[in-house]
């Protein structure tokens, strides 16, 4: 197969990734920090992320699906991998062969695990988000009897904001601890780490902020960006004042404009929310997005950078917090939507 050079690049900063994990581990106090690497490490590439964090000292990795666990199981001891979405009867033979640890979420999963041999497991407790997990009544009623529960975990619903729900979940989680024989306890995501030591317990589970996301105010002081986007300039054309650009003629050139078309679009995760709001750069010169983002292409106003020519590379602005504010997309969406057509280049 021919090794073509993709016309769009995703640059990934491995030293920033490790720096972010170490900063979050330090701020976890007596707890140690794991890493959420589900959804292909939020779109960056799970294998590359796991190797770097493993070498930095991380020993707890969280994925959502069993296929995600299998994809990294040759890189670390399988017992370091936790699978958040539980088990189904069709999973059992593969689960046993793989050796990763299930997070059990329902009474039916508890029964299935017991009846198929038991062994080390984790359990999700629902402290108020009402997604996955067992209730206070179920755990207090003895649902975990006879199980070898290593980690009891729960998930904060609103840790990125200062609301009473955070303390309510903390109190409920603290209450359930005495009702279990679990060896370890975990409540915090990236934002939760910043709520203070009371929330840390034994293990924290950062995700977004590993990859450069600012999960809570103040984290910008120590979280470094990991992701940078670049796209090739495919064509430059001179467009007269009054001419319209892009689908549905949403942009009219106010004056004569050098319009550049770059190789990126919503098929790559650069969504239509960037239409008329996105920014790109040639060095320190702003070349803003004009017109509507299409599937494979974006148009830019190149008037500020007359030296640009076909074949040049353009840096596409992708600061997660700032871009989320402008587009209305979450930082999570901005990361996980990044498509497979990027050449992912670690440096």
Which sequence ranges carry the predicted segments?
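Active-site-proximal beta-alpha core segment in soluble small-molecule metabolic enzymes
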Residues: 3-4, 8-19, 26-176, 181-186, ...
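Active-site anion/phosphate-binding pocket segments in diverse small-molecule metabolic enzymes
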Residues: 2-14, 18-21, 68, 87-89, ...
